[in-house]
Amino acid sequence: MSNPLDRHLEWLNQHTEEIIDAERPIIDPHHHLWPGESQYLLEDLWDDTSSGHNIKHTVFIECTQEFLTSGPDHLKPVGETIFVKKIADEAKKEPSKSQISGIVSHADMTLGEGINEVLDLHFQYGESLFKGIRHAGGWDPHENMRNSHHSPPKDMYLSDVFNQSLKILGEKDLVFEAWQYHHQINQVAEIADRNEDLTITVSYTHLTLPTI
């Protein structure tokens, strides 16, 4: 069975862009790793990072892969950290190639104080690579629009329990990665105002609404 990503590669390969400033060291701050049918793993990543630019390091961003299949639901996202850490360790065998130097994992930010247990396990298995949490908040009221992959409720970012979790991230010097639709960007600004000591990265500033 062919990889479904092949059709995307065919499209990309129609045009080759000029390499600009090829010697400048770059950190790629956002990529995924996909096992299974739509496979995109270390060798695929290296094919991209070695295509002309000087990409020294990358940061993996959660994509709900390889969750634990047993145990409490709130701890299952730790499986993705375990999965990526193994690949990052494998990459160290080829130090001349791009290294996965950060992992932004998932945890349910509506856990409040309960998030500490999840973060502790991410630290345990991700070690120094574990850098933060993404909990996607993309929500729209229209029935024919698809909400983001964590199935958030309306105004999740503004809830008291979510902001309790944000404060815990800040105390642990972890990053929060926000993922929202264009009409929710003011909510990101509001949580930034509430959490001045927290580093927030924004996955998408004006993400368009996907239809079902």
Cite the ranges covered by each PLM segment.
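A structural micro-motif
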Residues: 24-25, 53-56, 98-101, 128, ...
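An N-terminally biased module of ancient metal coordination in phosphate/nucleic-acid-related enzymes
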Residues: 1-96
